[in-house]
């Protein structure tokens, strides 16, 4: 299965009539492996900050997390595994696997829980595959 298929069929899938605004699978260096049409372009320093937060949980909390210059307030996550952010009526979930970052961005009416489920389910699957 191609990386684009994972994005199209597993991240951008419909959940209770809703779907993510955008999604992607990136390498730990920020290289895009696959993405949805509207996925924002991360800046290198944003990826650096995200990876540092995985290594040092809480690193982004004081400043917020920036994604394509949009600022997200960092909310509860799983140290070293998941970063969650909130921005207005939407938010972001990033799941770290051995080689990748699985990213989902949502807006209402999709809920944070639905975004978390979609992103973390694929991330957990990739971890089980050694990826």
Swiss-Prot record:
GO cellular component: cell cortex; cytoskeleton
Keyword Kinase: no
Disulfide cross-links: 13-115
Entry superkingdom: Eukaryota
Post-translational modification: Phosphorylated by MAP kinases.
GO MF annotation, one: actin monomer binding
PROSITE patterns: PROFILIN
Compartment list: Cytoplasm, Cytoskeleton
Pfam families to which the protein is assigned, alphabetical: Profilin
Assembly notes: Occurs in many kinds of cells as a complex with monomeric actin in a 1:1 ratio.
Family: Belongs to the profilin family.
Note: The variability of the residues taking part of IgE-binding epitopes might be responsible of the difference in cross-reactivity among olive pollen cultivars, and between distantly related pollen species, leading to a variable range of allergy reactions among atopic patients.
Name this polypeptide is given: Profilin-7
Biological source species: Phleum pratense
Biological classification of the source: Eukaryota, Viridiplantae, Streptophyta, Embryophyta, Tracheophyta
